[in-house]
Amino acid sequence: MIATLLTFSLAAMLLTLTPGLDTALILRTSIAEGRKNGFKAALGINAGCFIWGAIVALGLGALLAASQVAYDCLKWIGAAYLLWLAIQLILARPQPLDIASTSNQPKTTNWFLRGCLGNVLNPKMGIFYVSFLPQFIPVGQSPVMWTFLLVSIHVVMGTLWSTVLINIAAKASGYLRQPKIIQWMNRVTAGVFVLFAAKLALSSR
């Protein structure tokens, strides 16, 4: 049992350290919107992991893996959502540091929700959990309990790595949170979102 957990932890660590959509969202949010909003985005991403864990534990993930229609619907919704995020970043008007750092700045963006939806609307995450987690559930053990245990390990690692990224980004934000730099960063992040949207739209199970 210990060996199983150690093997899963190693695999989860490699997955966590691999740069992707979550990394881009956390870095951009932490630099342009501040440490607090960076943590909100990270918590949303982790909440999305728990939602997928619950879906897999309840057996609904098998439906996603078996049904092409269900997979395609979630895939296109996820791709459309990423494109919407990209458009929002492109149209965003960056503010200078002295304005962006004040408490009077309107807080209209729910970064927790954005992080969560970005994860939940990615069917690849569901397929990954469906195909990956069962390999580490010992025979005769409760699938529900072990699914949430494994997801919790993944989330803890994700939280630790997100904390490192957020702190690095927050320290650099004083130099990077300038209108032109934020605009450039928004466009780069938007480009990353568009690439992931295209990859998702063209993907198959």
Q: What are these model-derived regions, one by one?
A:
Residues 36-111, 168:
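Membrane helix-loop-helix hairpins that form the core translocation module of multi-pass transporters
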Residues 147-170:
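Hydrophobic alpha-helical transmembrane segments of multi-pass membrane transport proteins
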Residues 53-57, 121-126, 193-205:
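Hydrophobic alpha-helical transmembrane segments in multi-pass integral membrane proteins
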Residues 2-72, 131-150:
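Juxtamembrane transmembrane-helix termini in multi-pass membrane transport proteins
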Residues 65-95, 161-165, 175-205:
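Selective transmembrane alpha-helices of multi-pass membrane proteins
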Residues 6, 10, 105-117, 145-149, ...:
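Alpha-helical membrane-protein architecture signal
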